[in-house]
Amino acid sequence: MRTWKKLVATGAAALLGTVTVAAPVAGAQEPEAPAPTSLAEVLLADGDEFDRNAYDFDILTQAVLTVLAEKPDSPVAALTDGSVPLTAFIPNDRAFWTLVGDLTGQYYGFFKVQEEKVFNAVASLGIDTIETVLLYHVVLGDPIDSDTANGVPFGTPLTTAQGGDIVVKPIFPPFKWIALGDNDPNDFDPFIIPSKFDINKGNPQIAHGIAFVLRPLDL
């Protein structure tokens, strides 16, 4: 696997550029505030490896790594800088398994998703396509927590970092059932997994796990 920490550092540097730090005032002893946690750090928390858990985010992690390795200046690098406020809707490994099956007719495993084969199929789509799909899952600006998403009017649009819109659909607010409309009207709408609400809450970057991949065009 690629060295994640090196790629994260490269992506953050590309995003931030050169930063000049002012010298502290003599005698000042104020403790430094901890740096906010980025979603890149959260994605790395369970390791940079494929595994047998189809409901975590290994394929997404590898997709981010692949884009940053080939395109360090990509807007995807925002995920490595915890100070950039954003909301990401992150598909789990099963979601990518479904996408690859829909696109190719080939389903790699079932009860045990063959994550590396699924990722290789995703990678075969090309860097620019992967980048476009990733950015379609990111909304820049103040983080949108689950309570906020659950409370908006049905059909509220959100403009993504890719430039296209997704639509928030609170289906049954008392139970926080929230779907997301994308640009593929012929397939199931992704929905937010209730157990994966508000990942990294309390930081400028927040994520919600989703059960299908958002599609920026009609497949």
Please report, for each region that a protein language model flagged, where it lies by residue.
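Hydrophobic core
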Residues: 15-21
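Mature, structured domains of secreted/extracytosolic soluble proteins
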Residues: 5-10, 22-219
